[in-house]
């Protein structure tokens, strides 16, 4: 446990030194949130409900991007620089190394969630109960798991440029299809039909329900778990194939 703890702390420090983390995980979501709740006239019937809804969307957007891009691209960089090969020569087991990366990233998610929640509470005076704040934060931490697994899958790519391009496209498509940038209900029917099976939609849906006084559905939970298992199995299979070469 000591080794896992030390490696997790090391991973957290490395993430915080990454300028892309600050851009994608904090500056962009906060800027989008401010723009669409204070600058653009959205003509929504209930402005207060919209501000709480969109705060959850942008927090999910932040954590999703951090999981897919920050984690995935960093893993490819480590492989290209020989760091992953060096780790295999040390007594540190692979599963400890991967677990430390995911734990470190999850702790960083707590920071992102806290900063964005505070921004929404201060700028728009979002008035959720302590229980709703806590449950929303916990749900977002849970919902990030399949995206962390997707990040480790992207981390198996050979080139940083390829990983950056693919992760960027995936991130934007998942955000758009999952209803992060606009209410899911106003999206075209075809996009809704596709979006309802995306992990990003079920990630956001659970958070939206919580700020409306409800709770995530079992469908939200099961689909996120299914995607997490799928990405983990694919990652394990590809890693074994690569190690066999």
UniProtKB/Swiss-Prot annotation:
Its main location: membrane. It comes from the Bacteria. Residues 20-242 form the ABC transmembrane type-2 domain. The chain crosses the membrane at residues 20-40, 53-73, 103-123, 137-157, 164-184, 214-234. The keyword Transcription regulation does not apply. It is a multi-pass membrane protein. GO terms for cellular component: ATP-binding cassette (ABC) transporter complex. It is found in: Cell membrane. GO terms for molecular function: ABC-type transporter activity. InterPro entries: ABC2_TM (IPR013525), ABC2_TM_bact-type (IPR047817), ABC_2_transport (IPR000412), Nod_factor_ABC_transporter (IPR051784). The keyword NAD does not apply. Keywords: Cell membrane, Membrane, Transmembrane, Transmembrane helix, Transport. Belongs to the ABC-2 integral membrane protein family. This is Putative transport permease YvfS. The gene is yvfS.
């Amino acid at each position: 446990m000591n080794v896992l703890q030390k490696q997790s702390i090391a991973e957290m420090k490395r993430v915080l030194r990454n300028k892309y983390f600050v851009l994608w995980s904090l500056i962009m979501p906060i800027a989008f949130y401010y723009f669409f709740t204070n600058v653009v006239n959205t003509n929504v019937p209930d402005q207060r409900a919209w501000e709480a809804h969109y705060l959850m969307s942008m927090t999910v957007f932040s954590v999703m991007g951090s999981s897919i891009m920050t984690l995935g691209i960093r893993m490819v960089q480590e492989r290209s620089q020989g760091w992953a090969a060096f780790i295999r020569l040390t007594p540190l087991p692979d599963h400890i190394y991967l677990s430390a990366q995911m734990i470190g990233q999850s702790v960083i998610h707590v920071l992102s969630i806290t900063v964005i929640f505070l921004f929404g509470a201060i700028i728009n005076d979002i008035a959720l109960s302590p229980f709703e704040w806590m449950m929303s934060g916990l749900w977002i931490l849970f919902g990030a798991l399949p995206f962390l697994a997707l990040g480790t899958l992207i981390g198996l790519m050979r080139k940083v440029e390829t990983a950056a391009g693919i992760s960027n496209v995936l991130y934007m498509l998942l955000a758009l299809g999952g209803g992060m940038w606009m209410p899911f209900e106003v999206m075209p029917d075809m996009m809704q039909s596709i979006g309802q099976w995306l992990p990003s939609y079920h990630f956001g849906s659970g958070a939206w329900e919580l700020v409306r006084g409800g709770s995530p559905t079992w469908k939200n939970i099961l689909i996120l778990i299914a995607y997490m298992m799928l990405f983990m199995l694919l990652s394990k299979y590809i890693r074994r194939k690569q190690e066999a070469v």
